[in-house]
Amino acid sequence: MREIVLTQAGQCGNQIGAKFWEVISDEHAIDSAGTYHGDSRLQLERIDVYYNEACGGRYVPRAVLVDLEPGTLDSVRSGPFGQIFRPDSFIFGQCGAGNNWAKGHYTEGAELMESVMDVVRKEAESCDCLQGFQLTHSLGGGTGSGMGTLLLSKIREEYPDRIINTFSILPSPKVSDTVVEPYNATLSVHQLIENADETFCIDNEALYDICSRTLKLPTPTYGDLNHLVSATMSGVTTCLRFPGQLNADLRKLAVNMVPFPRLHFFMPGFAPLTSRGSQQYRALTVAELTQQMFDARNMMAACDPRHGRYLTAAAIFRGRMPMREVDEQMFNIQNKNSSYFADWLPHNVKTAVCDIPPRGLKMSATFIGNNTAIQELFKRVSEQFTAMFRRKAFLHWYTGEGMDEMEFTEAESNMNDLVSEYQQYQDATAEEEEFEEYAEEEEA
């Protein structure tokens, strides 16, 4: 049917990817060896979106796992679901990118690229009707950002008409693990603007906040953060994998969510937020789900949607629920908060409903917002970038790999343009044009 190939680049991308495969293998009742142990026809009906059926009825993920050092991939391989992947889906170098975007994009990463693309082609050829690619990576490191964006541009070259969406972990305002994060992130965003169709911006700080504030976890681990990300990733593709009353796929999402090609950076949210292993004591109502889903505290990007306006949004509900109630609640929220929605885009919220809830919940909702407040995220990175670039700090690491300073300047101005485009549409209203036309008529 409509297959998706998942590519994972770098340490962060592979850890999130591994968690994601655990989550959806559980949803489709597939054990760590790739054998099906379920009792529902629905679990197998569209399993081919993410899995290839191999001989002996084993299901193998359509995954490409890439890293420039063997460490992370070794731990994925020895992890709980390590045996489910095809051995030749693992492609790794030996020397690492050392948090250097240029190493990932131009030198070390470029050397591995041919063998990575071979695996991507092999996966794409085994598809019946390939819908698109998903990439999980972080923008702060070297491999996920540098090599991840190189992989994107290669895929875009070979498969120009397929949808590419990325789950990109952006540097956080307070939590930083690398000094050169602003450089790597800016150079990556520059690539994402041009080559991705949809980018889900997730950042660790927002995830930490959700874990400590909402889930009351005293010391959140990366495992907890990745659990949140994989819940969102699974929600975004639910409609492809399970039957529903209103379906959405990657392309429908893109068409409904992207009003202008450059503005494809979304903030995801998820409801209800529950910590790993905890059960919900009562089922939430559709109204509570909708409230929680639009709540600023549920956003997985560290920016406040109340500071901007929604150009578009999508809500994907899971579980048995009356359609009428869903429509009413979505209508209510737009009515009550109309100032937060762009009035020149009427009916700008897309809804999808899928009948199968995630494990352990009666119903859940995944939220995707294209909100102009996302500019806060890019502004923050841009300020840090400018502070360092003005002094040319750390630049020798990049120029030493053959990069030119011009590339930095271009990336910086492209990101600043993106910020001002978001600002322009945040200020736009439906009435402006009418006044202009009226004034022209008066003059005539």
Curated annotation (Swiss-Prot):
Chain residues that bind GTP: 11, 69, 138, 142-144, 204, 226
InterPro entries membership: Beta-tubulin_BS, Beta_tubulin, Tub_FtsZ_C, Tubulin, Tubulin/FtsZ-like_C, Tubulin/FtsZ_2-layer-sand-dom, Tubulin/FtsZ_GTPase_sf, Tubulin_C
The record's account of how the chain is modified after translation: Some glutamate residues at the C-terminus are polyglycylated, resulting in polyglycine chains on the gamma-carboxyl group. Glycylation is mainly limited to tubulin incorporated into axonemes (cilia and flagella) whereas glutamylation is prevalent in neuronal cells, centrioles, axonemes, and the mitotic spindle. Both modifications can coexist on the same protein on adjacent residues, and lowering polyglycylation levels increases polyglutamylation, and reciprocally. Cilia and flagella glycylation is required for their stability and maintenance. Flagella glycylation controls sperm motility.
Matches recorded under Gene3D superfamilies: Helix hairpin bin, Tubulin/FtsZ, C-terminal domain, Tubulin/FtsZ, GTPase domain
Pfam families in the cross-refs: Tubulin (PF00091), Tubulin_C (PF03953)
Keyword field: Cytoplasm, Cytoskeleton, GTP-binding, Isopeptide bond, Magnesium, Metal-binding, Microtubule, Nucleotide-binding, Phosphoprotein
Gene Ontology terms for molecular function: GTP binding; GTPase activity; metal ion binding; structural constituent of cytoskeleton
Annotated positions binding Mg(2+): 69
SUPFAM superfamilies assigned: Tubulin C-terminal domain-like (SSF55307), Tubulin nucleotide-binding domain-like (SSF52490)
Motif (MREI motif): 1-4
GO-annotated biological processes: oocyte maturation; spindle assembly involved in female meiosis
Major subcellular location class: cytoplasm
Family stated for the protein in its record: Belongs to the tubulin family.
UniProt protein name: Tubulin beta-8 chain
